[in-house]
């Protein structure tokens, strides 16, 4: 599949243009950028399924080529995702999906909770349910406010939350949602059996 560099106001990334009407803005985790191999593979899979995908760098990564995001800048990162969705709305006429990996998935879900009409669906890869070893510090306060359909993809060996913890946390979401478990995979989803068609199929079911 092919992609091309993309730039708009506050948005930097790569566009995977497809023939369908639906679109996706896809972003990375705290330690990476939009060139992460997993994001490239996910973008290619959805492009092949007819979805135009924008792989984008969050504002913190646009400012610094390495290092984690600062908590004080999280609102700026959400603003960057809002800008990415707006840019994609100019390119596609169909449904919009906001997707992210780890930190990116958390910011995507928080933005969707703040702005319920922003996107039709969320795809949240390796949502960081809590810091490793600290299950009391759940990051689910905004879950009851989610109104977009949501696909959660979680590794069975993810230290940021067990499958049981994730399943329990999702019970407070009233919007349609689905949890896909990748057996044997950790937080980076690199291990285990990971068929990308599971993602395209899961999102299609949610949006049907």
Give the location of each predicted region.
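Short beta-strand/loop motif that positions the catalytic acidic residue
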Residues: 145-147, 152-154, 158
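Primarily recognizes the serine-hydrolase "nucleophile elbow" in alpha/beta-hydrolase
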Residues: 81-148
């Amino acid at each position: 599949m092919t992609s091309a560099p993309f730039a708009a106001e506050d948005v930097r990334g790569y566009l995977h243009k497809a023939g369908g009407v639906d679109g996706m803005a896809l972003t990375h985790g705290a330690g990476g950028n939009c060139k992460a191999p997993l994001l490239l593979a996910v973008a290619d899979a959805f492009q092949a399924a007819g979805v135009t995908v924008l792989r984008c760098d969050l504002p913190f990564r646009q400012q610094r080529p390495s290092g984690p995001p600062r908590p004080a800048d999280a609102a700026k990162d959400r603003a960057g995702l809002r800008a990415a969705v707006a840019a994609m709305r100019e390119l596609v006429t169909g449904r919009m999906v906001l997707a992210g990996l780890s930190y990116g998935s958390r910011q995507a879900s928080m933005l969707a909770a703040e702005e319920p009409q922003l996107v039709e669906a969320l795809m949240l890869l390796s949502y960081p349910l809590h810091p490793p070893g600290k299950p009391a510090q759940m990051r689910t306060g905004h879950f009851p406010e989610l109104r977009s359909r949501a696909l959660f993809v979680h590794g069975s060996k993810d230290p940021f939350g067990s499958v049981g913890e994730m399943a329990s946390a999702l019970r407070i979401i009233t919007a349609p949602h689905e949890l896909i478990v990748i057996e044997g995979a950790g937080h980076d989803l690199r291990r285990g059996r990971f068929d990308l068609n599971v993602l395209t199929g899961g999102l299609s079911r949610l949006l049907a």
